[in-house]
Amino acid sequence: PNIAVLGADRNGRLINIIRDDGALECSNLKIVRIDGSLYFGSIEKIADYFSKIYDANDIQYVLIAADGINFIDLAAAEWLTNEIRKWQKNRGGIYFAGLKLVSQDVLKKGGFLDKIGNNIFYKDKKTAIAEIHEKFDKPCKMKVFNECVL
């Protein structure tokens, strides 16, 4: 799968930061877009990416822009559950915006939602950002989103 970090452009639109060097990233929330299926063959790449974010120890929250995730198999659901629980225990958390219902069903039917909770899923990025922003325990370093107060 393709993994892209999103930042806000000067119009407030979320955009791949590689495509706009003026795009701003939040100091408390990393927004990551994943395009492609999450399955046993793709988990290593994604796990490595999330390990780097976690090990950097400067981000409390991750929002996965998940409208590009077409499928999640049981191996990926197991990894996601463990990763989400690790972030919930030691940081702020991992959240999803726009995850297709068919992918949520895999998590639900496999019993994974019982472990991670249903409150980490949002229909859209805007709602997710607004609600996650309320959880911040560190002040914003820069005004990236409308919710940010300096």
Residue ranges and their predicted role:
Residues 1-150:
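Cytosolic C-terminal regulatory domains/tails of membrane transporters and channels
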